[in-house]
Curated annotation (Swiss-Prot):
A Pfam family assignment: Arm
Residue windows of the ARM repeats: 57-99, 100-140
Protein's name in the database: Armadillo repeat-containing protein 7
UniProt GO cellular component terms: spliceosomal complex
Residue(s) carrying Phosphoserine: 169
InterPro entries referenced in this protein's UniProt entry, alphabetically: ARM-like, ARM-type_fold, Armadillo, ARMC7
SMART domains in alphabetical order: ARM
Ribosomal protein listed as a keyword: no
Length: 198
């Protein structure tokens, strides 16, 4: 288990966040990386940290972590992005950094928490209405949402249904249904996991 970064108490929040980022970049321990990324994702929940997190390029750290093979790192990274993206500046950074395809890739994760955060992040990146990015509602994404809307998990099923109703046109849903009927889409539904004990 990673130790708390050694931070001068007079350095404050920015110093503490900088120590976390430095520890993430320097440690070789996967457990330490997971713990640090979880901490950063939790700090991303507080809007008073947004400016510090942008300054320390934590959004890019989260985006880079979406490509990791370690599912836990991916879960915490998408959770951090989900916490950050309601803010306009953070949303613009994610969009301009090419984050949408990385987030869409998270829809195929076997981890339900990762998928839920990915769907929520996509929803935050595109407000309801017809002025959203086409890639957010591309046919493969809509097909995923159709599959998720049939999930045994109420959270996944309900979130997918909201996405389909609020972010997709009836034409997009009909087209995705039509294509899905003619394809062998084999992406398994994510598995539910019990909440982690910390």
């Amino acid at each position: 288990m990673a130790q708390k970064p050694k931070v001068d108490p007079h350095v404050g929040r920015l110093g503490y966040l900088q120590a976390l980022v430095t520890e993430f970049q320097e440690t070789q321990s996967q457990d330490a990386k997971e713990q640090v990324l979880a901490n950063l994702a939790n700090f991303a929940y507080d809007p008073s940290n947004y400016e510090y997190l942008r300054q320390l390029q934590v959004l890019d750290l989260f985006l880079d972590s979406l490509s990791e093979e370690n599912e836990t790192l991916v879960e915490f990274a998408i959770g951090g992005l989900c916490n950050l993206c309601p803010d306009r500046a953070n949303k613009e950074h994610i969009l301009h950094a090419g984050g949408v395809p990385l987030i869409i890739n998270c829809l195929s994760s076997p981890n339900e928490e990762t998928v839920l955060s990915a769907i929520t992040t996509l929803m935050h990146l595109s407000p309801p209405g017809r002025s959203f990015l086409p890639e957010l509602t591309a046919t493969p994404v809509v097909q995923c949402m159709l599959r998720f809307s049939l999930s045994a998990s109420a959270r996944l099923r309900n979130l997918a249904q909201i996405f389909l109703e609020d972010f997709c046109s009836p034409r997009q849903v009909a087209e995705a249904r039509s294509r899905q009927a003619h394809s062998a889409l084999g992406i398994p539904l994510p598995r539910s996991v019990a909440p982690r004990q910390r």
